[in-house]
Amino acid sequence: VEGATAAEAEAAIDALIELHTRWWQDESLAALTWLPVPIAPAYLATVPDIYRAGLPVLEAEWGDRLLHGAVDVARTLDPRFEALMERLAAGPTTLSHADTRLDNIFFPVDPAEPVAFIDFQLCMRQRGVCDLAYLIGTSMQADEAREHWEALLRRWHGRITDSGIEYGWDDCMLHYREAALYYLCGAMSLIGSFDTGNERGAAMATAYTTRVFDHAVDIDAIEACP
């Protein structure tokens, strides 16, 4: 609930860089039939409906809790959501953890040691930048994300390209914005139908929703969704 610091986000991103570069555009991932992609039939059949189920609740109850323009972003995305999912599947692909929230990250006592990720049950073959959009957009306080998101993205992009991978900055920025829009569906799930269970769960749901929508506004994410 407190959120990650910029230093913690850097450490997590450095670990993700190793994962992403190892599997970047690796065709052997396509042979893993159990490893989903963003447009897997199960996702196409459920995720847009989850998004739309939360929209009336967002409009009725959250307008004064989010940055100005957040509800307009949600409305604009509504008829474009399936097209967004198609674009997310276009690549470049790698092995993505796909659930990079703080609960799934262990930080070492010695900062020189790498962090460890757990809970790979949602891993998929998709753009690596999606892991950054999820981490920054949902696990950092809005002010921290606002101040550091571009530097964190440039850190990841620089290390990716330094490894010999060709990936333009403009594409990276576009793909980050698209991913930030996609993860609004998680907030819609929380406010639309998900039982948070207890006080901590409710606090986490509130933090997730405000952070992810405020981040989408801060980075002009909707500009990535014509």
Stretches found by the model and what they are:
Residues 1-97, 108-110, 209, 214-216, ...:
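ATP-dependent phospho-/nucleotidyl transfer catalytic cores
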Residues 93-95, 115, 127:
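Hydrophobic "anchor" residues on beta-strands that sit immediately upstream
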Residues 99, 119:
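Conserved catalytic-loop position in the HRD/HxD motif
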Residues 105-116:
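Conserved protein kinase catalytic/activation segment
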Residues 122-163, 180-200:
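Active-site activation/catalytic loop segments of kinase-like enzymes and analogous catalytic loops
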Residues 165-180:
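All-alpha amphipathic helical-bundle segments outside canonical DNA-binding/catalytic cores
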Residues 178, 182-226:
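ATP/Mg2+ or Mg2+-diphosphate-binding catalytic cores
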